[in-house]
Regions:
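Short substrate-entry loop that stabilizes the transition state in hydrolases
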Residues: 100-105
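Residues lining the SAM
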Residues: 96, 178, 202
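The conserved beta1-alpha1 loop
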Residues: 93-97, 170
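Lipolytic serine-hydrolase domain surface
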Residues: 1-69, 74-79, 85, 106, ...
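Gly/Ala-rich beta-loop-alpha elbow adjacent to hydrolase catalytic centers
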Residues: 150, 169-173, 177
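Proline/glycine-enriched tight loop/beta-turn segments at coil->beta junctions
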Residues: 84-90
Length: 271
């Protein structure tokens, strides 16, 4: 497989040659495009990733063929517009979660697009995660700092000609996503001019009461959001412990409670 991954990020550009963006926060949003290839030996759900001591082999591993940086939003929007037009007017925005380095986020959206056979234009929104398990508080603050940037990125995708914008958020990325959608609702444009498609909330690392308040401000969506939860999610169990033993949305035991908000709750505990 070959996929052009468009990137909007609140990360700082890295000083290391082998790393494009690092875990530091940037006050400005940066833009790029990465041409990714998926090896023929790829298995669904997996990311075949080269270890440091292994030679580069696109036949065995996910591989970044080239990286294009854009000097400003205008240049990025022009390139994005051409891709969206060539892909039937569809775009998918993926927002990663906690403990995710830049390269891991790129690999993950590539795997999602490859395995789902997605036909639109993939857009990665990557906020400044420290990429370490001990950076939970830092990541939480970075996610909060990225809310306005994600809101503007969604508006940019709409301006670039997308007729349908799908969203997949994972873990702590759901906090950024829900805050951006809440801000869109406050501005009177909660569905991006009828362009909002599927909104998938996968294992959301959000306090249940906070989510309820976000949905109350957003309102019942015209098309139900899709929530994937599991009551045996170890990562969310740790998150809940750090938050004072408060239940997280992604492992909430009362999915029928959430369904009243206009959300299809899919319990994957037994899967």
């Amino acid at each position: 497989g070959r996929h052009d991954i468009f990137v909007a990020t609140t990360r700082e550009k890295s000083d290391r040659p082998a790393e494009v963006f690092d875990g530091r926060r940037s006050p400005q949003t940066s833009y790029a495009k990465i041409d990714m290839t998926v090896p023929g030996v790829h298995k669904t759900g997996e990311i075949e990733r080269r270890k440091r001591n292994q030679p580069v082999d696109p036949g065995k591993y996910f591989f970044a063929q080239s990286i294009t940086g854009y000097g400003d939003e205008t240049a990025f929007e022009k390139a994005l517009r051409a891709s969206i037009a060539a892909n039937g007017g569809r775009a998918l925005v993926f927002i990663h979660g906690y403990n995710t380095a830049f390269d891991a986020a790129v690999y993950r959206i590539t795997q999602i697009v490859q395995d789902s056979d997605y036909k639109g234009t993939p857009v990665l929104f990557t906020w400044a995660s420290g990429g370490s398990t001990v950076d939970y508080v830092y990541d939480n603050n970075s996610a909060s700092a990225a809310r306005d940037s994600l809101e503007e990125t969604l508006r940019l995708v709409a301006r670039a000609g997308a007729k349908r914008i799908d969203i997949i958020a994972h873990s702590m990325g759901n906090w950024v996503t829900m805050e951006a959608l809440r801000q869109l609702a406050i501005s009177g444009d909660r569905d991006l001019g009828k362009r909002l498609g599927d909104v998938v909330l996968a294992s959301p690392d959000i306090d249940v009461d906070v989510f309820k308040s976000q949905m109350k401000r957003y309102g019942v969506p015209d098309k139900p959001f899709i929530l994937f939860l599991s009551r045996d999610d170890r990562a969310l169990r740790i998150s809940g412990f750090l938050a004072g033993n408060r239940p997280r949305l992604g492992d909430y035991g009362k999915p029928e409670d959430i369904a009243q908000l206009g959300v299809v709750a899919v319990d994957l505990s037994q899967v």
